[in-house]
Amino acid sequence: MRALDTLGFMAGSKTAPLTERGLATRKKFTLALADLLCSYSVSEITVKEIVVRAHSTRQTFYRYFTSKEDVLHALLADLYDECYDRVLNSSGTTFEDYLVVYFSFWRERYSRLHAIMQHNPHWLFNEVAYTYNRRFYPKIKGLWATELLDERGEQYFQNFIFGGLSHVHATWFAQGCAQSPEDMAHYVAQCWTIYKQSEE
């Protein structure tokens, strides 16, 4: 099941079966919206404009999406799915290794995302994005003694890790990704090391 469905964004929508052709059609709409977001805020964009940019029809649009917000969520979901797959398939073995892959992914896309965020500043770093970042937890939880935590403690631990990562990511983007992915990964990993040393 795709993460988009898991988060309930497609619940109740009239989605067409996601065959290979269906996925390609769906992708046309998300890419069309991405193009428009580089010049306009989402509040200014209409379904008609998305349809025209995708060279499609409203009838086809509503087979896959219920609204422009639905397309926006799908675009964000696709982006984080791609990042997740990159990290998941990496050869990293440490938290810092995974962070290098994570920050490298986003830096490669900075120019395009920066253009979008000039008109939609809160699009990339929001509750949806934070929810997606939490998907990395099974990949990295073995790096810490999380078995010592009860259910509530583990939930707070995830909030600590991924809430912090989301804010660091947002700050890095706001500063134009001036630091390299390797430097960013080291900074974040070093913060964790300092925290652990303070306990000893």
Feature-to-residue mapping (PLM):
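Basic/polar phosphate-binding segments, predominantly the helix-turn-helix DNA-binding elements
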Residues: 9, 13-22, 51-72, 105-108, ...
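Secondary-structure edge/capping motif, primarily at the C-terminal ends of alpha-helices
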Residues: 86-90, 113-117, 144, 172-176, ...
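Amphipathic alpha-helical packing segments from all-alpha helical-bundle domains
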Residues: 101, 122-147, 152-167, 193, ...
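Conserved acidic
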Residues: 17, 21, 25, 94, ...
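C-terminal peripheral helix-coil segments that are non-catalytic and often amphipathic
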Residues: 2-10, 171-200
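An amphipathic alpha-helix adjacent to DNA-recognition modules
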Residues: 23-34, 38, 43-47, 52-55, ...
